[in-house]
Amino acid sequence: METEQLARSHKELRWSLRLSRKKKKTSHKSATIPVYKGKFGQREAERLLWRAGFGPRPGDVKRVKKLGMKRAVHGLVSHRGGTKLIGAGPKLDDPLKPDDIWGHDHIWWLDRMVRSNNPLQERMTLIWHDWFATSNNGVGSQKLMIAQNEMFRRNSLGNFRNLLLNVTQDPAMLVWLSGNENTKYSPNENYGREVMELFTLGAGARYTEEDVREQARALTGFTNEWDEDVGLKDFHFEAKLHDDKSKTIFGKTGNFDWQDSCRLCLEHQDHAGFFVQKLWSYF
């Protein structure tokens, strides 16, 4: 009798677990964003081109509408054939060069936004520029700002981890948030705070002031040279300026460096939700 009851209980338990798994799958599925299955006419094609770029050029709406939504989206996300500028450029006495004269960097970029055959790349470049906000007013080097812009473009649709690693050692960002002055002798908390509050976790996320201080220690070691003719140059990591002692960040302890700092932020429980919500807000 006891054997039969145990067998029945075991069977009921397995059935209960199976139902539980089914419920979990169902609830997870219902939480996903439904795929649009409505019509894809002129209005929808125009909306897609405005959302994924900077609006349609002559002929774009007709072309995208003919492709259909699925193929049009795939073409925007997985652009092939190289990036080219379409149509006539701005009329100037001299060729448009980003580092030529004051203001040409802005005109050069706006021209790319308008004429690029890869609009989502330029849209994402602008998004990353806003996400990891810097300004030449603080950096003081048009050359470094243009290099950062090109870096955002190369990483426009790539892996966010790689982008964060590139941003963390980017010369313009190092100057903007004093990363090039952050040493074991005098830790600077600017980037350590911003990488959590603005870039990966959000204001009010689950981190402490002690985490900020420990992040600053992990991020020590970047520096640069100065030349009176050239200005800021030769940005690099110098081991002797890095704090190689043990640190505790988000409750984890280790001899963390700047790459660990990025990794720990991306592994934090608040990162995924912050990332999706912030990226979604741009569209």
Task: Describe each PLM feature range.
Residues 2-31, 77, 88-92, 102-110, ...:
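Active-site substrate-binding loop specific to GH73 endo-beta-N-acetylglucosaminidase modules
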Residues 2-8, 14-32, 37-51, 55-59, ...:
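Terminal end segments
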Residues 21, 42, 46, 60, ...:
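A generic structural signal for solvent-exposed, polar alpha-helical segments
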Residues 35-44, 100, 115-122, 186, ...:
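Structural motif
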Residues 44, 51-155:
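N-terminal accessory alpha/beta regions
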